[in-house]
């Protein structure tokens, strides 16, 4: 079987992106962990980002947000 006739990955056949597939796999692994490793992994799951609004071509003060998958 050549590379051009190889089977499509099952995540692509299911209509998913690789990022979506890897996020689901990571969540399953985190749910299988025992304490204290489970709570450590949950603390690393949070996402920190900043949002800046622009008015009249000038950036206002950015606000920092923290989101989790809860």
From Swiss-Prot:
InterPro entries: ATP_synth_F1_esu_mt, ATP_synth_F1_esu_sf_mt. Coiled coil: none annotated. It is found in: Mitochondrion; Mitochondrion inner membrane. Keywords: ATP synthesis, CF(1), Hydrogen ion transport, Ion transport, Membrane, Mitochondrion, Mitochondrion inner membrane, Transport. One of its GO terms (cellular component) is proton-transporting ATP synthase complex. One of its GO terms (biological process) is proton motive force-driven mitochondrial ATP synthesis. Its main location: mitochondrion. PANTHER family: ATP SYNTHASE EPSILON CHAIN, MITOCHONDRIAL, ATP SYNTHASE SUBUNIT EPSILON, MITOCHONDRIAL. Mitochondrial membrane ATP synthase (F(1)F(0) ATP synthase or Complex V) produces ATP from ADP in the presence of a proton gradient across the membrane which is generated by electron transport complexes of the respiratory chain. F-type ATPases consist of two structural domains, F(1) - containing the extramembraneous catalytic core, and F(0) - containing the membrane proton channel, linked together by a central stalk and a peripheral stalk. During catalysis, ATP synthesis in the catalytic domain of F(1) is coupled via a rotary mechanism of the central stalk subunits to proton translocation. Belongs to the eukaryotic ATPase epsilon family. F-type ATPases have 2 components, CF(1) - the catalytic core - and CF(0) - the membrane proton channel. CF(1) has five subunits: alpha(3), beta(3), gamma(1), delta(1), epsilon(1). CF(0) has three main subunits: a, b and c. This is ATP synthase subunit epsilon, mitochondrial. It comes from Zea mays.
